[in-house]
Amino acid sequence: MINGKFKSRFAKQFAIGLGVALAASTFAVPVSGAKQAPSAAAKNDLTIMIGEPNGGWCNQDSPGVDQIAAKNSVFETLTILNSDNKIVPYLAKSVTGSNENKTWTITLREGILFHDGEELTAATVQMNLMANLGIIKPFTGKGQAASLPAIAWQGIMPTASPAQWAANVKIISKYVLEVNLGVKRPNFPYTLWNVGRPTILSTKTLQDPNCGNTMGAGTGPFMISSKGVDQFTTVLKANPNYWRSTPANKLPKASTVTFKVVGDAAQRVNALRKGQADIASFGATSGQQLNLLKTLKDKITLIEGPRETTWSFHLNATALPFANKDAREAFAQAFDTDSYTKLMTKGNGSPAYQLAVKEHPYYQPKGTLKFDLAKAKASVAKYTATTGKSLDVVVPINTTAESLKGAQALCKMMEAAGMKCTIMSPVTSQQYILRGFGLQQQMSLFNVVAGRSAEFANLFSTKTNLELSGFRFVNPGLAKCFADAAEVDTRKAYSTCVLELQAQSYWVPGYVEGGFLAWTNTTKGIGTTPLPGGGVRPIIGASGFDVASVTKG
């Protein structure tokens, strides 16, 4: 549960950041006024094209997947996910749990320097945890106010006073600190990575009002040269003191990295073909362009990351029509995930028959309603008989062409089942998210179930103001079920909750996707790279790729 004094400002600040994280990670972002992309620069200068506009990189910001990849080139995490899907220490040398996983001891690697010369110590991490909790500004008078990360961190380590803070995070020695949680968290090392979000920043960066906007010092392979001045261009330069660099393998390989924002996927493909970009990222709904890239194997390499992100429709259960179970079932039975996925991804996504992929703790193979037009019509008739109203569906959209295309397809399905369906006027992703959290629209299409951990999804299925279906009001026992299950964090623990979520059709699965990365044949070094904590880093993952090893040749 969220502390009341934080709650009112969380939803707004969270939505501002998360509008990109949840919407733009898949749907192309239209960019007007973007400058013409320059030709990819000299041998050691990389140009990477992404679809997501500039976003904040500080602790309380919520960038989307493209910006996370850029951010992780500058700032790094205490732990990281390897290619075996295991969380291993990264900036940390070890992370050890005790006291039923309520107490965690973090031991840091020694000698790691931030870009501004500060050494990574327990005191630095303590300050970062204060920033993660959203208490750095009220406690020190400097830094960011609370937003999404604070919701997550306050949920596991409530901290409202200096006395609580002193008890929660203790410095044991220069490189060792102890973190005391308010609940059991067996997956706390994942929380320290959390898809590349909780990065570690220098103390001066955390206290600077421009933290993550125009400045920032991290421990990563690249340093900020220019950010936030041109919303479509971020320029990074090599860190000469990078901690992973060795005499035998000097890192980073590139001298500079320029991230260029180009919202149109077709333009990103064209830039790769013309040598105006070395690397570009894509979402599954850029299906036509992805299929084109597959025909250019002699010039361009295309790889898909793990297909583990499930997009679902969160139906607002606090008001008609979806306060009525018959209406929710009619929607679920009328939705044809096979045809929807084929239309939207052109073979680059998968139909979603459950709320999560098999590797996710929320996965339950039974319980979701499947496409059945006859049953959908029967549910519509039952709704009308019960309420005396026609079943009128209103679909919200953002400003992208893909969003409109998806809504039009959805309306055709609903109308085939006997419902009336209209599409709302387009709004920005930020406005879409704000309305969703305010339960001011009938449904919200979100990708909250991703990867192989329940940590992020739990924010949207427990009693927080981020829960998009409003079942925390109409079915509070379900929200408590998820909160209790999180303390065990196993599929078995979540099973009762997920089966109820599916049985009530609060969430209706849409489609599954993975991220795509493409690079020219003159770009070298993209691949799995060794991790100091064990295993190798995936070629592409939820937090991007190892840009430190990339160059041209």
Give a label for each model feature.
Residues 107, 142-203, 228:
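Surface-exposed binding/hinge segments that line
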Residues 222, 350-383, 397-405:
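Structural transition elements
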Residues 232, 334-362, 401-411, 430-553:
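Detector for C-terminal structural segments
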Residues 49-99, 130, 217:
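N-terminal lobe/hinge region of extracytoplasmic solute-binding protein
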Residues 184-252, 256:
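Gly/Pro-rich hinge or "lid" segments in bacterial periplasmic/extracellular proteins
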Residues 210-217, 242-292, 420:
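Ligand-site clamp/hinge motif
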Residues 51-71, 91-93, 118, 183, ...:
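A structural "hinge/loop" feature
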Residues 93-145, 178, 321-323:
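Aromatic- and charge-enriched surface segment that lines or borders ligand/interaction sites
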